[in-house]
Amino acid sequence: MKEYKTITQVAGPLVFVEKTEPVAYGELVTITLPDGSTRRGQVLDTSKDVVVVQVFEGTRGVDTSSTVRFTGDIVKLNCSQDMLGRILSGSGEPIDGGPKIVPEERRPIVGAAINPYARQYPREFIQTGISAIDGMNTLVRGQKLPIFSGSGLPHNDIALQIARQAKVRGEGEEFAVIFAAMGITYEEAYQFMKEFERTGALERAVVFLNLANDPAIERLLTPRMALTAAEFLAYEYDLHILVILTDMTNYCEALREISAAREEVPGRRGYPGYMYTDLATIYERAGRIRGRKGTITQMPILTMPGDDITHPIPDLTGYITEGQIVLSRELHAKGIYPPINVLPSLSRLMKEGIGEGYTREDHPQWNDQMYAAYAEGVDLRGLVAIVGEEALSERDRLFLKFADEFERRFVQQGRYEDRDIEYTLDLGWELLAMLPERELTKVERKFIEKYHPKYRKKEAKPEEATEEAS
């Protein structure tokens, strides 16, 4: 294995090496410093004359007298079922004090998008225990559904709650969570580790933690490490995997940092022009494969800089993924948790995972009616700000009250409150009962008579009388 002393330039986290024999893109590199210490790196770019190497541990102390050795290997993850219950660094090394993982297989982390011909359409409901998601923006197996948040909003709490509570319905269905956090502080890392251990959620999870002071290149590896683990567990052990990636904004910032160090021509707002393609290599690894029992579902979480949904990161994410869940600063200011604004939120594949055989027969029409009633109530708030509530009709006041109760009772729930889908749907019917039946135009009469609280109470009365007599 040849060693080279042909470093010509060190720029930020990058080292430029000349006159090398052909090397592979993504190849691992060992750099030996004059004092004998070593650093690891990865080939980022190759050309006829120059190889660009990104150094994992930073380039402090690296100079033109340092020695570069190309290993002939690429970044791989030690994959094993023993990963479940472990907390790993962003580069896949154990940081929980436990033993190293003995690999059943070492897999390249680059992976590949699923062959479109082999893809199976996402179906079946995943229950998160959060009413605003399960009822109004349902997550289905094989979907990629991002959460658009803002700085200071409780997206980390929501991520932890989903990781604790997420489950698939049906006997014999095994489920696990892969949780990958990128660019987080020590405080956040401590919170994640303690929460997973305290609640017992770690038993069915693999956690990857990349800290803010870790190298930028590791931030680019972390989601790929997580997805490689997900693919192994899903397709080798038939598990249904939910991958939670937070915060993809930190990932994109690392991508921009490395692009700037390489002196590439910037795209929108300084991000590289290939960011769309790069994000697609992550998001498109979710899905279902025909003939395989296991599935991979993704929930990437990102903070929108300046709460701007047109910013390149949420904008490009929205093009690739199948919907979005939007957090609201206004709801957060009201003390509502989780502050999910259901009106701009959307799950494009929701129709494939709800209804008879999945959740409940009334769910699709129930959802349409809930959206319509809440949207009308929110519109009326704007009118009240101009003319005052006294100018509203009795009907309008009912819709205004519905919107308030919807946020207070339906959207708001405890951080450890795990609601099943039946509870969520019944709660929605209780709210719809505030409105006159003639206003429930999006629900068939048979569902009103079956699930409306007024009719359910009538059905319950004979049973209550029998119990009292006995």
UniProtKB/Swiss-Prot annotation:
Q: Could you tell me the keywords of this UniProt record?
A: ATP synthesis, Cell membrane, Hydrogen ion transport, Ion transport, Membrane, Transport
| Protein's UniProt keywords contain Protease | no
Which BP terms from GO are recorded?
proton motive force-driven plasma membrane ATP synthesis
> Which GO terms fall under molecular function for this chain's record?
ATP binding; proton-transporting ATP synthase activity, rotational mechanism
What is the predominant subcellular site recorded for this chain? membrane
- Where does the record say this protein resides? Cell membrane
Q: What is the purpose of this protein?
A: Component of the A-type ATP synthase that produces ATP from ADP in the presence of a proton gradient across the membrane. The B chain is a regulatory subunit.
The family database entries (HAMAP family) matched by this protein are listed as: ATP_synth_B_arch (MF_00310)
Oligomeric state and partners? Has multiple subunits with at least A(3), B(3), C, D, E, F, H, I and proteolipid K(x).
Record protein name field: A-type ATP synthase subunit B
- The organism named in the record is Archaeoglobus fulgidus (strain ATCC 49558 / DSM 4304 / JCM 9628 / NBRC 100126 / VC-16)
Lineage, top ranks: Archaea, Methanobacteriati, Methanobacteriota, Archaeoglobi, Archaeoglobales
Gene symbol? atpB
